[in-house]
C-alpha cells in the first residue's frame, strides 16, 4: 500500500483493539459459520454436498475478484466506506440467509457474503493499519491476528448453540445483528479522517501501472502467488467441511465442536512461536516448516479412524500441527 504522510500516524491502541474485535466477529460469523450450517442446509433445501459446497466456493471467488478494487479504494482513502459498507452488506446477507428457500437464493447470498469478506477480513484491515501506522503496522497486525485467531474458538461453540436453540435460520439472523449493531458502527466511527497519500511518495499513474505489472510478472511474485494459492486452497477448504468430516469419522458431537474451536487457540500459539523463531532463529526456518506442518496434520486426521485407542491422541496431533501451521501462515503471508 502507499506510504502516507507522517501526520496522525502514531500508534493507537484503542483503534487497533476495537478493529480486532470487529475482526473476531467478522471471521467468526461468516467464515466459520458455513461448516455448521452445511448439514441443515442440505436437509432442508434438498441439496447434495457438491451443491451446498458451491455456495462457499462462489463466496471465495467473489472475494478474490473484489480484492484488487478494494485495495485500490482503501489506498485512495475510502477505508471507512469500504469497511462500514462491508459490515452492513455482511449483516444484510446473513439476515437474508435466514430466509433462503432455494439453491439460487443460497448462491446469491453467498456471493454477497464473498463481497463482504473482501471488505472486512484481514486483507483490507491490514491495508488500513499499514496506511495509518506506517512505522508500527507490524504491531497492529500482530494484535489483530491474535484476537482474530480466536474467532473459531469463540464462534463455533456460540453458533452451534444458537443453531441448537433457535434453529439455523434464526441463528443466521442473530449473527447478522452483530454486524449491524457492532461491526458497522465500529468501522464507521474508528475509520474517520483517513490519512492522505503523501505527496512525496505519489507516483504518476502510468509509471505506477508499469511498475505494478513488472512486479506481477516477476518469477518471485509468481512463485509466491502459486504457494499462497496452493496453501490457501487447503486452509480455506478444510474449515468449511471440518464439522461434517469429523461427524463422518464417527466422533461425538462434543468432539465435533471442540476440535475446530480449539484450532483457533492453537493458531495464536503458532503466531507466538513465529515471533520466538524471529528473535532466536532464522525466520526463514519457520517459513520452511509451515508447508510441512499442515500436510502432516491432515495425514493425522485422515489416519485417525484406523488408530484404535489412540484415536483421540491422533486427532489432538492434527489440531496442534494444523493450528500452528495455519497460525504462522497468516503472518508470513
Located regions from the model:
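Extracytoplasmic
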Residues: 14-52, 66-70, 156, 231, ...
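Hydrophobic core of transmembrane alpha-helices in multi-pass small-molecule transporters
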Residues: 24, 93, 104-120, 145, ...
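Extracytoplasmic gate region of multi-pass secondary transporters
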Residues: 30-39, 213-276
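Intracellular juxtamembrane helix-capping segments at the cytosolic ends
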Residues: 41, 117-133, 328-333
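Helix-to-loop junctions at the C-terminal end of transmembrane segments
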Residues: 65-78, 270-283
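Helix-loop-helix hairpin linking two adjacent transmembrane segments in secondary transporters
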Residues: 103, 135-136, 143-195
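Flexible cytoplasmic inter-helical loops of multi-pass small-molecule transporters
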Residues: 190-210
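C-terminal transmembrane helical hairpin of 12-TM major facilitator-type secondary transporters
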Residues: 228, 235, 255, 261-267, ...
Amino acid at each position: 500500500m502507499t506510504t502516507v504522510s507522517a501526520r496522525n500516524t502514531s500508534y493507537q491502541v484503542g483503534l487497533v483493539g476495537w478493529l480486532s474485535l470487529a475482526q473476531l466477529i467478522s471471521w467468526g460469523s461468516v467464515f466459520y459459520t458455513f461448516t455448521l450450517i452445511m448439514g441443515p442446509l442440505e436437509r432442508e433445501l434438498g441439496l447434495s454436498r457438491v451443491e451446498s459446497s458451491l455456495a462457499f466456493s462462489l463466496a471465495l471467488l467473489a472475494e478474490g475478484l473484489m480484492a484488487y478494487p478494494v485495495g485500490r479504494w482503501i489506498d485512495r482513502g475510502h477505508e471507512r466506506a469500504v469497511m462500514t459498507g462491508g459490515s452492513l452488506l455482511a449483516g444484510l446477507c446473513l439476515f437474508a440467509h435466514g430466509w433462503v428457500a432455494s439453491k439460487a437464493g443460497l448462491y446469491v447470498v453467498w456471493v454477497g457474503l464473498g463481497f463482504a469478506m473482501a471488505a472486512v477480513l484481514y486483507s483490507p484491515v491490514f491495508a488500513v493499519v499499514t496506511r495509518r501506522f506506517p512505522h508500527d503496522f507490524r504491531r497492529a497486525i500482530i494484535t489483530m491476528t491474535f484476537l482474530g485467531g480466536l474467532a473459531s474458538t469463540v464462534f463455533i461453540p456460540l453458533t452451534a448453540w444458537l443453531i441448537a436453540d433457535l434453529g439455523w435460520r434464526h441463528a443466521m439472523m442473530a449473527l447478522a445483528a452483530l454486524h449491524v449493531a457492532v461491526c458497522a458502527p465500529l468501522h464507521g466511527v474508528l475509520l474517520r479522517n483517513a490519512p492522505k497519500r503523501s505527496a512525496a511518495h505519489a507516483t504518476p499513474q502510468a509509471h505506477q501501472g508499469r511498475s505494478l505489472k513488472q512486479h506481477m510478472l516477476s518469477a518471485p511474485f509468481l512463485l509466491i502467488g502459486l504457494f499462497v494459492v496452493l496453501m490457501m486452497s487447503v486452509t480455506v477448504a478444510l474449515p468449511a467441511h471440518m464439522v461434517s468430516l469429523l461427524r463422518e469419522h464417527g466422533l461425538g458431537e462434543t468432539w465435533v465442536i471442540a476440535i475446530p474451536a480449539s484450532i483457533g487457540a492453537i493458531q495464536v500459539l503458532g503466531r507466538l512461536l513465529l515471533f520466538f523463531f524471529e528473535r532466536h532463529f532464522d525466520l526463514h526456518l519457520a517459513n520452511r516448516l509451515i508447508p510441512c506442518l499442515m500436510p502432516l496434520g491432515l495425514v493425522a486426521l485422515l489416519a485417525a479412524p484406523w488408530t484404535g485407542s489412540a484415536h483421540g491422541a491422533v486427532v489432538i496431533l492434527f489440531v496442534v500441527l494444523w493450528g500452528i501451521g495455519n497460525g504462522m501462515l497468516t503472518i508470513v503471508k
